[in-house]
């Protein structure tokens, strides 16, 4: 089956990216190295859903849909801590695995578990295909669009994309914010 979108990494970001693509009517495949979706929230059992501390605590429809599905199983609770403007939710990681899988399946998405992306073939600056390895051996997977949702930008690194990481990025962002604040102060 040909896929329009291939998502490498089925953690929280990969599952949500897949749901977003599926809701746009795009055939979507998630390639996940572990045996379930959800990444560190499920396999790592990092169970609090931390607030974003943005004004009015904006939430996307997919976030609310996932939380509503979890709540059907009494597997999600939200609480507003004293002095906080945003809620902090807790969930059962086993149910999150099931809910993410159910939502991907319900929206006609595909997932291959226990599958590693071992290489990417880049032609004229675009990914032509990724090479995956699982019990079926090595296989090429093609798509129109590839999304890297791996924890360490593994697909980007395979393609030779320049990356910032760690303190280098934080320093760059901090300098940019400081420069913008100075500019705004002088403009007033």
Residue ranges and their predicted role:
Residues 121-140:
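Conserved beta-strand-loop-beta-strand element in the redox core of flavoprotein oxidoreductases
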């Amino acid at each position: 089956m040909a896929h329009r979108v291939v998502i490498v990494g089925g953690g929280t970001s990969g599952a949500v990216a897949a749901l977003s693509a599926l809701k746009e009517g795009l055939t979507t495949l998630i390639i996940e190295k572990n045996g379930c979706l959800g990444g560190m929230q499920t396999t790592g059992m990092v169970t609090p859903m931390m607030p974003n501390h943005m004004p009015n605590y904006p939430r996307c429809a997919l976030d609310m849909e996932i939380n509503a599905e979890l709540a059907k199983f009494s597997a999600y609770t939200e609480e507003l801590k004293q002095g906080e403007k945003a809620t902090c939710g807790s969930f059962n990681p086993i149910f999150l695995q099931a809910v993410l899988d159910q939502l991907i399946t319900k929206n006609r998405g595909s997932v291959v578990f226990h599958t590693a992306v071992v290489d990417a073939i880049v032609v004229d600056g675009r990914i032509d295909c990724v090479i995956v390895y699982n019990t079926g051996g090595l296989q090429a997977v093609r798509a129109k669009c590839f999304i890297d949702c791996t924890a360490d930008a593994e697909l980007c690194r395979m393609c030779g994309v320049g990356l910032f990481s760690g303190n280098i990025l934080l320093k760059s962002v901090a300098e940019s914010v400081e420069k913008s604040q100075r500019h705004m102060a002088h403009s007033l």
